[in-house]
């Protein structure tokens, strides 16, 4: 059953080929057998999952008897990134700071998917507070890449991507602040979508950088991501950044024709320094879409080269404010025997946060400090406006933009741990999308020495249906997304 896509599993449940309990037990058994080596889960919610599966089976049986329509995700097992609050279940955000935090409420994303009948398998490992590109900053240890256990799965949604790559779950939720859905999707040979900023509610999602964070689906195929987004998307009055925009018919959009669609190729996404094999895989994907009737033109995003430095001012600045609430007073790790309030703050935060989180808090506080605000934070926001304008000009000429998702394949565990700048460059092609608030998807487009590569499709605001359709058409013509690693008998 684990070789089937989410969409295929949905059809099997509807037809009565197997029950949700059988399906859920199958994935729980795989997690139990293989995740000790992979470390992709922080918490497995076995009892809750089986109870939800039994309830789903009852719903499916009733609906089959009455020819009624079940929820979009009824009976389908899904893993949630451990950044989404889940009532009564630990929500750690990959940090010692929240190691014992039991959320008193459930995030909107989890709530909406549960309302559509989804079964929660558990909570996936992640870089601490979503700060990282390799899933090595987690308090619970690094996640391994199922294609090579000596390599990283990418981050920060590395646990979600790795468990999907190894077929320990058919689908998962992730979050993307600078590439945290798309980069690990590329490194694990899965499909991942970052929606338009505000398309999916952030309520109950622990904040890293509030103007950049966005939740999205991760799965084997674009069709699966469309199914998940249909359940996740929508306005939420509890989230002030949620946009009251009509939810599209994402599954219906997969039937649209792409003949005449114009694909823009930003020259900045194919620099001379890029690994030639990665460039070739993405160019091959673009050529495949040309065969299907799409047109290709060259475009330029001149300010995109400034995206990484701008991001690493804006995101840490927002993080320094968001993480100030974790002080050991109301919740979070509290040090033993504090001498006074100042000692409580200092030691609780020093003990609770890891090195990368501390680094970003310091950088962010510095950028916002008197005398440096104009030199760094204000200037970074001006660069952000330039990047947004570059994308707007490009979309006057084209429908979508395409290029490699990541500049390299999965690197060795520990290879960049002492070189933060090198680690930050892992998101060089993805960060600009977050700064502009655009939707983008990563899809599998080949291998280099047995390691997956991905190609990114960027769309205009609220054009998720279009980029999902482009990816779906490509996946109908190719089988890269069907390739699975030898690990855990995923093939």
From Swiss-Prot:
Coiled coil: none
Pfam families cross-referenced by the UniProt entry: Amidase
Reactions it catalyzes: L-glutamyl-tRNA(Gln) + L-glutamine + ATP + H2O = L-glutaminyl-tRNA(Gln) + L-glutamate + ADP + phosphate + H(+)
Broadest EC class assigned to this enzyme: ligase
InterPro entries: Amidase, Amidase_CS, Amidase_dom, AS_sf, GatA
GO molecular function terms attached to this record: ATP binding; glutaminyl-tRNA synthase (glutamine-hydrolyzing) activity
UniProt GO BP: translation
Alphabetical list of NCBIfam families matching this protein: gatA
Subunit structure: Heterotrimer of A, B and C subunits.
Function text: Allows the formation of correctly charged Gln-tRNA(Gln) through the transamidation of misacylated Glu-tRNA(Gln) in organisms which lack glutaminyl-tRNA synthetase. The reaction takes place in the presence of glutamine and ATP through an activated gamma-phospho-Glu-tRNA(Gln).
Protein name, UniProt field: Glutamyl-tRNA(Gln) amidotransferase subunit A
Species in which this protein is naturally found: Alcanivorax borkumensis (strain ATCC 700651 / DSM 11573 / NCIMB 13689 / SK2)
């Amino acid at each position: 059953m684990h070789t089937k896509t989410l969409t295929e599993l949905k059809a099997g449940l509807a037809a009565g080929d197997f029950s949700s309990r059988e399906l859920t037990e199958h994935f729980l058994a795989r997690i139990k057998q293989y995740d000790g080596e992979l470390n992709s889960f922080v918490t497995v919610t076995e009892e809750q999952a089986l109870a939800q599966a039994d309830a789903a089976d009852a719903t499916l049986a009733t609906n089959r008897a009455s020819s009624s329509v079940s929820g979009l995700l009824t009976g389908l097992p899904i893993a949630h990134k451990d950044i989404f609050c889940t009532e009564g279940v630990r929500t750690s955000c990959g940090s010692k700071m929240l190691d014992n935090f039991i959320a008193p409420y459930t995030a909107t994303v989890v709530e909406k998917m549960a309302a559509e009948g989804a079964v929660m398998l558990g909570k996936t490992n992640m870089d601490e507070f979503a700060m990282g590109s390799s899933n090595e900053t987690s308090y619970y240890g690094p996640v391994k890449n199922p294609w090579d256990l000596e390599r990283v799965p990418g981050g920060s949604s590395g646990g979600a991507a790795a468990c999907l790559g190894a077929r320990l779950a058919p689908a998962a939720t992730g979050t993307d602040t600078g590439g945290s859905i798309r980069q690990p999707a590329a490194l694990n040979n899965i499909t991942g979508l970052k929606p338009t900023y505000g398309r999916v509610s952030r309520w109950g999602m622990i904040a890293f950088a509030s103007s950049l964070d966005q939740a999205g689906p991760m799965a084997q195929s674009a069709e699966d991501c469309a199914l998940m987004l249909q359940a996740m998307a929508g306005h939420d009055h509890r989230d002030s950044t949620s946009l009251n925009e009509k939810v599209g018919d994402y599954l219906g959009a997969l039937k649209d024709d792409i003949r005449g669609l114009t694909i823009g190729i930003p020259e900045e996404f194919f620099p001379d320094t890029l690994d030639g094999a990665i460039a070739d895989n993405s160019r091959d994907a673009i050529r495949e879409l040309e065969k299907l009737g799409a047109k290709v033109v060259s475009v330029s995003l001149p300010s995109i080269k400034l995206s990484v430095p701008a991001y690493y001012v804006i995101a840490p600045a927002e993080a320094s404010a968001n993480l100030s609430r974790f002080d050991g007073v109301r919740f979070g790790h509290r040090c033993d025997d504090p001498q006074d309030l100042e000692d409580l703050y200092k030691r609780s935060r020093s003990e609770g946060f890891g090195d990368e989180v501390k680094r970003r808090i310091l950088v962010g506080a510095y950028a916002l400090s008197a005398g440096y605000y104009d030199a760094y934070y204000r200037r970074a926001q001006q660069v952000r406006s330039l990047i947004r304008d570059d994308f707007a000009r490009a979309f006057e000429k084209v429908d979508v933009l395409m290029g490699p998702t990541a500049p390299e394949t999965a690197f060795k565990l520990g290879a960049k741990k002492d070189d933060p700048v090198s680690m930050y460059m892992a998101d060089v092609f993805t960060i600009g999308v977050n700064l502009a608030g655009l939707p983008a998807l990563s899809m599998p487009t080949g291998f280099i020495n047995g390691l997956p590569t991905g190609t990114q499709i960027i769309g205009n605001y609220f054009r998720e249906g279009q980029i999902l359709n482009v990816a779906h058409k490509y996946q109908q013509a190719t089988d890269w997304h069907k390739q699975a690693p030898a690990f855990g008998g995923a093939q």
